[in-house]
Amino acid sequence: MVANIRETELSDFERVIGLLRQLWPDKELNRNSLLKIFSTCIRSPDNIYLCAEIDGHVIGFCSLVVRENLRVEGLVAHIDELIIDEPHRRMGFGAELLEAASAAAKKKGCKIVELDSAFYRQDAHKFYSKKGFEKKAYLFSKDLRS
């Protein structure tokens, strides 16, 4: 079975929120805040939001941010979220969505597509390595909300 990969629409929001709950099970999601960000990002030329669907049902989501980068002397696409619905994992849909995301980034003129992944997501790390991604750096983060 092959997924239909398409640009995300505002009407996909509720399903995407359900997928994000799987990606971040310990995070309390603020629906109103996320809706505002989601609706802005799907219209921005600096973002690529893709959904994977089977029989009209969204089973996957990927978001990328495109930006200029001095290191690569051009555009870089960063994958912020990539999630496949739990019952549909290990069926090739993640690979399809990742390939579509890479193709969309290339079409926008990006030289590199990159992502970060939590240390505990060992299966995801193996998946990304198999798909040609190389471990290049650690991500350091500082919370500025307090």
Regions from the language model: what does each represent?
Residues 68-79, 89, 136:
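A conserved beta-turn-beta hairpin within the catalytic core of GNAT-like acetyltransferases
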Residues 17-39:
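Conserved GNAT-fold acetyl-CoA-binding loop/helix
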Residues 95, 119-137:
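Conserved active-site alpha-helix within GNAT-family acetyltransferase domains
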Residues 51, 57-66, 83:
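Conserved beta-strand in the GNAT
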Residues 105-116:
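Conserved GNAT acetyl-CoA-binding A-motif
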Residues 41-51, 78:
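A short helix-loop-beta-strand connector motif used in the catalytic cores of GNAT acetyltransferases and
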Residues 84, 90-103, 130:
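Conserved acetyl-CoA-binding loop-helix of GNAT-fold acetyltransferases
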Residues 2-16:
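A short beta-loop-alpha structural element at the N-terminal edge
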